[in-house]
């Protein structure tokens, strides 16, 4: 009897795990469709970037496509700062260059520590590739 209970428990556990994975993929697929329909929507973009990060998937294409819909002067907006701060990590990205060249403007809107930390993380990440080789 105990074996049957254990077997049923394992089967249910596996079934729930499969359903959770399917929901995760369904959620990602829906977010991708919403993003492709309107790549300028910051809310959908942030949700998609968060989901990609949670699943350990690359996000550079999404970031690049989103920022193609934004003007440089809009990089200072809250939602764009959160995308730059949390998801842009390429030292050569136009957003990082803009941040570097306009640090004082960002510091007027956001914390000096956040701005410096972002720049520091990007530059250290860039330099690490040379130490890894």
Residue ranges and their predicted role:
Residues 1-22:
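Classical Sec-dependent N-terminal signal peptides that target proteins to the secretory pathway
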Residues 21, 26-133:
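Non-catalytic all-alpha helical scaffold/repeat segments
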